[in-house]
């Protein structure tokens, strides 16, 4: 069923979401990464990217924050582009683990594959697969170019965050070498880990992430730049991964309450994809106990519920002038 709203009405809903949520004091910044602990906890922004390229944004949508685990979506897309859907399914997988995003136990339980590119083990494996094999500099160029194409503008490496991540990524070092033990990493483990750490340290804005989400929702064509970033056949694959594990062990609760596949990161960003309709992103540093932005979750839920939209329903948003 079509749900028609004017652009002005949609802007009003996004503004309402911001106003409703901005005073929420729940959660706290990630404190195990020094850089993230010191980010202003009051920063908050929401951005929506329609498939015609129009964007609606309220609050701190131009502030560059650490992309963190939202980057897993971007690199999963790059791996899908370079290898195809079947090879990624065979070598990495697409299953939720039901365990925390940085779980080592998940590797031990399913050592035939890392489960999904959207948890740490699968993301490190995906970084190892990025072509060309054996060339860290060219791999990095490919990762950054892919993020740029998805977002419609370039990210910026946050050097201080990269240092913080590198100094504290002991668990991920264990993951990389355990993957090597099970032949589930496809380049030098230390190189793959460094690429993963750097990609998590990219600085992006909520506006950029909404455009990236819009690119997925638009079947691989960036709504703003009009560039075809990836083949339309891959859009349902990456969206399925996001729907299955975007909020890790709390993904079921998220899908039940919001109705939109979304990926979260401990930098405070959440990126949601409503196929054929729009991309949405929100950012606020304070996190809940599972590492998900409290305000970003509430803001996206508000927009979805206010508009009566759900990926599992037949409601379809039509924005008219």
UniProtKB/Swiss-Prot annotation:
Enzyme Commission (EC) number: 3.5.1.2
Swiss-Prot/TrEMBL catalytic activity: L-glutamine + H2O = L-glutamate + NH4(+)
Subunit: Homotetramer.
Keyword terms of this UniProt record: Hydrolase
GO MF annotations, alphabetized: glutaminase activity
Binding sites annotated in the UniProt record for substrate: 69, 120, 165, 172, 196, 248, 266
Cross-referenced NCBIfam families: Gln_ase, PRK12356.1
Record-linked InterPro entries: Beta-lactam/transpept-like, Glutaminase
UniProt GO BP: glutamate biosynthetic process; glutamine catabolic process
Species the sequence originates in: Bacteroides thetaiotaomicron (strain ATCC 29148 / DSM 2079 / JCM 5827 / CCUG 10774 / NCTC 10582 / VPI-5482 / E50)
Name of the protein: Glutaminase
Entry's family note: Belongs to the glutaminase family.
């Amino acid at each position: 069923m079509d749900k028609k709203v004017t652009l002005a009405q949609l802007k009003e809903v996004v503004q309402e979401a911001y106003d409703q949520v901005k005073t929420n004091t729940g959660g706290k910044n990630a404190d195990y990464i020094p850089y993230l602990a010191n980010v202003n906890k009051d920063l908050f922004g929401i951005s929506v990217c329609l498939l015609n390229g129009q964007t609606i944004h309220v609050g701190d949508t131009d502030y560059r924050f650490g992309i963190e685990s939202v980057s897993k979506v971007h690199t999963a897309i790059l791996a899908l582009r370079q290898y195809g859907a079947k090879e990624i399914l065979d070598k990495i997988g697409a299953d939720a683990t039901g365990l925390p995003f940085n779980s080592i136990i998940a590797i031990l339980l399913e050592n035939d594959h890392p489960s999904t590119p959207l948890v740490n083990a699968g993301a490190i494996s995906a970084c190892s697969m990025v072509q060309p094999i054996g060339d860290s500099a060219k791999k990095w160029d490919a990762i950054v170019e892919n993020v740029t194409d998805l977002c419609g503008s370039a990210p910026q490496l946050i050097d201080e965050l990269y240092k913080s991540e590198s100094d504290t990524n002991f668990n991920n070092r264990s993951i990389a070498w355990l993957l090597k033990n099970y032949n589930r990493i496809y380049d030098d483990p230390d190189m793959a880990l460094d690429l993963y750490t750097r990609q998590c340290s990219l600085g992006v804005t909520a506006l950029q992430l909404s455009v990236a989400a819009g690119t997925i929702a638009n079947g691989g064509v960036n709504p703003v730049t009009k560039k075809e970033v990836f083949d339309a056949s891959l859009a349902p694959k990456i969206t399925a991964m996001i729907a299955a594990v975007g909020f890790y062990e709390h993904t079921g609760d998220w899908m039940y309450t919001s109705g939109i596949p979304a990926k979260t990161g401990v930098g405070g960003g959440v990126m949601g994809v409503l196929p054929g309709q729009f991309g949405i992103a929100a950012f606020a540093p304070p996190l809940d106990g599972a590492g998900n932005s409290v305000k970003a979750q509430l803001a996206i839920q508000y927009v979805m519920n206010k508009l009566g939209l759900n990926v599992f329903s037949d409601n379809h948003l039509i924005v008219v002038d």
